[in-house]
């Protein structure tokens, strides 16, 4: 599949950008910093797909036709947290670390973002062998794959975006792990009871998740919420508290916060 890649100078903060992109159901993008320290937004349009409306007045810095492999080619294997390696090259053969192979699908969700890194950090810390885990808003499926490789007995990964679901399925197959991947608007298509719920999405969407998460958890379940901008942390914590969830731990990288919750 070929994409049109458009590059913009990022004019707004990352939180506002993500909200606008997600509101329009747009998930194929990457945020990066160039050598001059400028923040750039790269968006990838499929054939027939239109640009998010708020970008129509932004100046295009660069434009080209590309394939997913083109934008992944510069990524080298890297250790997302201690002993967990993300490998877009499929060249890593070592067996002393957990290795996650990623297919060149969507640009967002390679593991480079601090919200993904913090989520993996807490998965390593709180996931117990034999746990049942659900990854809500799975993107490329990286968190679900890590959970399975950490020893979870059953893992489900869900996302509202059909392309993300297809990419996650491809990555699950590439890693030879048993993970159920399906399209779902948060927990609408999720049944059963889970020991750990991990979700790397926007703060406002966490509020919706908290309305329904009790249905699929028990009194000892762990809830990992990532993708929260620090200015909206209290909003999420207050909602969680009202729903009977207490804070166990938090971690912050730059403006991004990840919370670990347990039932009170």
UniProtKB/Swiss-Prot annotation:
It is an enzyme of class 2 (transferase). It comes from the Bacteria. This is Ribosomal protein L11 methyltransferase. Keywords: Cytoplasm, Methyltransferase, S-adenosyl-L-methionine, Transferase. InterPro entries: Ribosomal_L11_MeTrfase_PrmA (IPR050078), Ribosomal_PrmA_MeTrfase (IPR004498), SAM-dependent_MTases_sf (IPR029063). Its EC number is 2.1.1.-. S-adenosyl-L-methionine binds at residues 116, 137, 159, 200. It is found in: Cytoplasm. It catalyses: L-lysyl-[protein] + 3 S-adenosyl-L-methionine = N(6),N(6),N(6)-trimethyl-L-lysyl-[protein] + 3 S-adenosyl-L-homocysteine + 3 H(+). It comes from Thermotoga neapolitana (strain ATCC 49049 / DSM 4359 / NBRC 107923 / NS-E). Methylates ribosomal protein L11. Pfam families: PrmA. One of its GO terms (biological process) is methylation. Belongs to the methyltransferase superfamily. PrmA family. One of its GO terms (cellular component) is cytoplasm. Its main location: cytoplasm. One of its GO terms (molecular function) is protein-lysine N-methyltransferase activity.
